[in-house]
Amino acid sequence: MRSDTIKKGVERTPHRALIKGTGVPQSQMDKPFIGVATSFTDLIPGHVGMRDLERFIEKGIHSGGGYAFFFGIPGVCDGISMGHKGMHYSLPTRELIADMVESVAEAHRLDGLVLLTNCDKITPGMLMAAARLNIPSIVVTAGPMMAGRGTEGRRYSFVTDTFEAMARYKAGVIDERELGVCEDNACPGMGSCQGLFTANTMAILTETMGMSLPRCGTALAVSALKRRIAFASGEKIVDLVRNDITPRQILTRDAFENAIRVDLALGGSSNTVLHLLAIAREAGVDLPLETFDTLAKETPQISSMNPAGEYFMEDLDAGGGVMGVLRQLGSLVRDNPTVMGLSTLQLASTVESVDERVIRPLSNPVKKEGGIAVLFGNLAPKGAVVKQSGVSDAMMTFEGTARCFDSEEAAMAALMGGRIVAGDVVVIRYEGPKGGPGMREMLAPTATLMGLGLGDSVALITDGRFSGGTRGPCIGHISPEAAEGGPIALVEEGDRILLDIPNRRLELLVDEAVLQERRARWTAPEPKIKTGWLARYAKVVTSAYTGAVTSAD
């Protein structure tokens, strides 16, 4: 075992003394040492229930014959950090989390890992660490929140209802009482936000790839099932250690293709593009951005999930969950190992029934193509991403007038000031991985667009990214980003921009000679943040095209 490095031999007497100083008895020293990386915090609804799950994981590890050690990992809530300086830190924490898990596991020679996670950047950070370390690992996602409840059977979704309610209130569509009802009911308790936003999409994809146990991706945070899954995961990690089952045996090219297909079939968050690219890089799997678009043309969307549709995570779980989706996808799914021990197709075959109102058959899709499309053109030579499942038919093709803003705050001021009108294309730039820095989510501007009733007449493009709660004609991840001199930096007020999702085009309708002249006089702006962790991050982070990973190259 790896832990023998710190447990065996006379020269390890000091190491054993320190371990015994934590209370570990001699009788437990020959057992596998299992690290439980927990992202518990009482700052985030998605993580506030983890203390209970920690207990069940620990019981499972001891039942399976291992010895559990806990160590802490930070958690940032994208909802709380949205719309202010805090959002600069969200995506960078993914890299911090991966580095922290690696550091603790290597420094203490842990034999295996249980990765307790839930919210947006924490799950991909944990998976990046697992793939990088390649020691036996299993993921436990803490589960989604129940839908909020209102009068007359109304169900609330935190992301769509609260952010869009803010814009509707500002526009005079709803009053202060209705706004308050939304605020008080949108988050009824613990769990990740209720729709198919980034946290829940990543939980689903983690199960799809085989890195968590069946039902883990959809079982509600409040459920007894989630606790049983936590216990079983604790038992299972000891088995994985004894049989030397490692993440790279599971995180194969087939696993990533399955994850992308499930993402497309459900209309999941566009952030998964960044995260799957980053995880694949750590796993040594070649996964070009174009893969998402290739598979989107072959994979129909078969579920109408919130935010763009009517169903919540509790509906998906009851309707068949991840394995139900895999069963409906049928021959599109590739067989692959899982931490459970059964293969992907074996697990899918155990599903007895699927609620076809929630998870439709391939013969009756919601849309003929999957939920994410990748666009190219002179505005995005290295690609841009759109969640096409959230775009109305009227906006799949659109030509409009550029309204240029060099920050999210400037764009929000224009939106709330009534300066954006039908026919505009809102351009938010210098918000990419380097330029932001941190590639902030533009949920506030996109929710404001929808709340103001402009979702069918105004488009938004950015080198930043979007929340999983974003819907509407919103194009993100534009690469190269403005801070690197990408074409989005050359757009000027009044330019015409063409968005053509069916033909995968994003074009700036300006002569090349004019663009060359603009490029010749372009100079990079001063960094927005010059000190601290983010200043260092901006120097080593790469393009959205490669997953916005950090690199020393």
Swiss-Prot record:
Q: Which cofactor does it need?
A: [2Fe-2S] cluster; Mg(2+)
Q: Which residues form the active site?
A: S467 (proton acceptor)
Which EC number(s) are documented for this chain?
4.2.1.9
UniProt GO MF annotations: 2 iron, 2 sulfur cluster binding; dihydroxy-acid dehydratase activity; hydro-lyase activity; magnesium ion binding
Judging by the UniProt lineage, the source's domain of life is Bacteria
Q: What class of enzyme is it?
A: lyase
Pfam family name, one: ILVD_EDD_N
Q: What is this protein called?
A: Dihydroxy-acid dehydratase
Q: Which gene encodes it?
A: ilvD
